[in-house]
């Protein structure tokens, strides 16, 4: 059985990147929550 995490920079950016977050209402809420918390990095 192979490991579940097979790193890929492209997939990481597409799924968890800033533009992916901005594309949906839920993603915008995630960013807003992270801004409110004062996170240094908002997204991948």
From Swiss-Prot:
InterPro entries in alphabetical order: Ribosomal_bL34, Ribosomal_bL34_CS
GO-annotated cellular components: ribonucleoprotein complex; ribosome
Keyword Oxidoreductase: no
Family, as annotated: Belongs to the bacterial ribosomal protein bL34 family.
GO molecular function, one term: structural constituent of ribosome
Keywords: Ribonucleoprotein, Ribosomal protein
HAMAP family recorded: Ribosomal_bL34
Transmembrane annotation, as ranges: none
PROSITE patterns: RIBOSOMAL_L34
Name this polypeptide is given: Large ribosomal subunit protein bL34
GO biological process terms on file: translation
PANTHER family cross-referenced by the UniProt entry: LARGE RIBOSOMAL SUBUNIT PROTEIN BL34M, MITOCHONDRIAL RIBOSOMAL PROTEIN 34 FAMILY MEMBER
Species for this entry: Beijerinckia indica subsp. indica (strain ATCC 9039 / DSM 1715 / NCIMB 8712)
Gene assigned in the entry: rpmH
